[in-house]
Regions:
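Tandem repeat scaffolds
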Residues: 1-146, 159
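Alpha-helix boundary/capping residues
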Residues: 17, 237-239
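Short, glycine/acidic-enriched capping/hinge loops at junctions between secondary-structure elements
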Residues: 38, 162-164, 235
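Short, low-complexity, polar/charged sequence segments that are solvent-exposed and flexible
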Residues: 43-45, 168-172, 241-245
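Glycine-rich loops and low-complexity Gly/Arg-rich segments
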Residues: 48-50, 175-177, 248-250
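Non-catalytic interaction/regulatory modules that flank or connect domains
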Residues: 130-221
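Extended catalytic/binding region for NAD+/ADP-ribose chemistry, centered on the ART fold
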Residues: 214-235
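Charge-dense polyanion-binding interfaces
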Residues: 239-253
Length: 253
């Protein structure tokens, strides 16, 4: 059960904490308060919720904000240097001029956020697109009946990815459809999402309603992975099977 933390209580914690220690604020609720310009460096906020909290200019450097609920928050000019933001809910937030240098935002939800002036560096993880921004390349996906699909994403295809390893494009050529070991070949494969969407070997597949917004992950487009291993990992996760045969799939090249 989450614990409600009042502002004065939080300020006392910050005042009394040893600067060499990491303040544990996991599974807490912060509600209806102004924390603007507060020093929240080196704090563990895993699974905490911020509801109607002003957080502009807050310094979160070296903190863990994984799984934190920040929807609609004003985080303008905040520092997330070297922070972990795995699966953080940042929908509808104001991230204007936020510093993400060295931050890891894997799985963070950035839908409908204001992102003008965001600062990143070479150590920022999962902010850049996973797939090549230009040119043609090979990709992989899985379909019904444990079928593995190898795709060619053409140079003129629109492509995008959010903060996960999944990518999307508006069109692709189907190079091969096989079983997970690539020993049994098929002529076609049926999409998980749309039973009428069929990938046919040698033909182009065109997405219905491709959404160019890169921060929307579950939306229109042909979804794919950059590696066979990632595609097979996804296949195992949705099937819920950790069988020996599944292990063999990932080991086969």
């Amino acid at each position: 059960m989450k614990k409600i933390i009042e502002k004065e209580q939080l300020l006392d914690m910050l005042k009394n904490i040893d600067k060499n220690e990491r303040l544990d604020l996991r599974n807490c609720i912060f509600k209806d308060m102004d924390l603007s310009e507060l020093d929240l460096r080196n704090v563990d906020l895993d699974w905490s919720d911020f509801e109607n909290v002003k957080l502009a200019n807050v310094d979160f450097e070296n903190s863990n904000l994984s799984n934190v609920f920040l929807e609609h928050a004003d985080l303008s000019n905040a520092s997330f240097k070297n922070c972990t933001l795995h699966a953080t809910n940042l929908r509808y937030t104001d991230l204007t001029n936020v510093d993400l240098s060295g931050a890891d935002i894997f799985g963070a939800n950035l839908e409908e956020s204001k992102m003008d002036g965001i600062k990143t560096d070479e150590n920022t993880k999962h902010y850049k697109m996973v797939c090549p921004e230009t040119g043609a390349f090979l990709a992989w996906k899985t379909c019904f009946n444990t079928r593995l699909v190898r795709l060619l994403i053409p140079a003129d295809a629109r492509r995008t990815s959010s903060t996960l390893n999944t990518c999307r494009c508006d069109k692709a050529k189907v190079l091969a459809v096989t079983d997970p070991t690539e020993t049994v070949k098929f002529d076609e494969a049926v999409s998980y999402v749309d039973g009428d969407f069929v990938y046919k070997v040698g033909e182009m597949a065109y997405a219905k309603g491709f959404n160019p917004d890169r921060w929307r992950d579950s939306t229109g487009g042909i979804h794919f992975f950059m590696t066979k291993e990632e595609a097979l990992g996804y296949l195992m996760s949705i099937s819920g099977e950790q069988s020996e045969s599944a292990t063999d799939w990932t080991e086969s090249k």
